């Protein structure tokens, strides 16, 4: 879809090109401080993903605009990450819920900087460390299907699927062993906590919190820098980490959905 087409619907729309296709982003005028925003990724061949940050009182603003966008594009596959209250049925669509997530946000000035858990540890930039981070991800996440899946997940972040990789991204090494990593992406001016992980032997020692806080403070010196994060609703460890980082939880549960137009259902 052309930027001129979507900007007719979404004032001040921004566009970026990424590995999987163009990204379009807009905020609700006057509601910047609530991060009420919409992002769409055109993945090519009629495949789109939508990501809506909104609260119930903003749904009305986005309903008409999302409906207009979906009427303008030709799509064969549409996935959306939206607040649970978003009224797909009212717009003539069915939403099949695939997963539940929580969202968090805050400003850099709210994130405390803890002491490094071990003074002999060394932080290093993520630059050139994709394979090392993939190994860390595989070791840290028992649900990861395997090496290729870990490489793909890390590679997507490096190649900008979620936005440009930021300089605060890095990993930590202790006694010659890499024990954890944190990857941060630029999402149209906000810092997105794209991935944080530590190996089992380093868990519950404060490393994830330190890596995230250290990385965030390396990204920017602006105390009002926005930070965003999203996590699976069943991920208790990440939930506790968000609390430790002093980020605010978006009150509403988030749905990851597959969207189908009602008229196309048999």
Each PLM stretch: what is its role?
Residues 58-71, 198, 204-221, 239-244:
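Conserved acetyl-CoA-binding loop-helix of GNAT-fold acetyltransferases
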Residues 88-93, 241-243, 247:
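Conserved active-site tyrosine of GNAT-family acetyltransferases
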Residues 36, 97-99, 179-180, 208, ...:
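A structural microfeature
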Residues 5-9, 115-191:
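Flexible, substrate/cofactor-facing loop regions flanked by secondary structure
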Residues 78-80, 193, 227-231:
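Conserved hydrophobic beta-strand within the GNAT/NAT acetyltransferase core sheet
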Residues 21, 75, 224-226:
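Short, high-confidence coil segments that cap the C-terminus of an alpha-helix
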Residues 11-73, 174, 179-194, 199-200:
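Conserved donor-binding loop and adjoining core beta-sheet/short helix segment
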Residues 53-119, 253-259:
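Acyl-donor-binding surface of acyltransferase catalytic domains
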């Amino acid at each position: 879809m052309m930027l001129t087409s979507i900007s007719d619907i979404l004032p001040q729309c921004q566009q970026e090109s990424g590995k999987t296709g163009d990204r379009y982003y807009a905020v609700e005028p006057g509601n910047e401080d609530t991060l009420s925003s919409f992002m769409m990724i055109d993945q090519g061949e009629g495949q789109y993903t939508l990501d809506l940050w909104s609260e119930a009182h903003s749904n009305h603003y986005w309903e008409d605009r999302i409906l207009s966008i979906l009427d303008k594009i030709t799509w064969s596959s549409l996935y959306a990450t939206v607040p649970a209250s978003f009224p797909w049925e009212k717009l003539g669509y069915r939403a099949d819920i695939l997963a539940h997530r929580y969202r968090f946000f805050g400003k850099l000035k709210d994130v405390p900087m803890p002491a490094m858990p071990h003074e002999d540890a060394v932080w290093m930039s993520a630059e050139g460390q994709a394979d090392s981070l993939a190994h860390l991800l595989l070791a840290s996440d028992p649900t990861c299907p395997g090496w290729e899946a870990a490489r793909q997940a890390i590679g997507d972040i490096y190649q900008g699927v979620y936005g440009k990789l930021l300089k605060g991204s890095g990993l930590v090494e202790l006694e010659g062993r890499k024990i954890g990593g944190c990857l941060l992406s630029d999402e149209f001016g906000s810092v997105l906590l794209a991935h944080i992980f530590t190996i089992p032997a380093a868990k519950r020692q404060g490393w994830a919190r330190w890596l995230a806080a250290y990385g965030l403070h390396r990204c920017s010196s602006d105390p009002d820098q926005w930070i965003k994060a999203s996590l699976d609703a069943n991920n208790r460890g990440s939930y506790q980490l968000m609390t430790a980082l002093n980020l605010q939880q978006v009150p509403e549960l988030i749905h990851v959905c597959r969207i189908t137009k009602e008229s196309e259902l048999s």
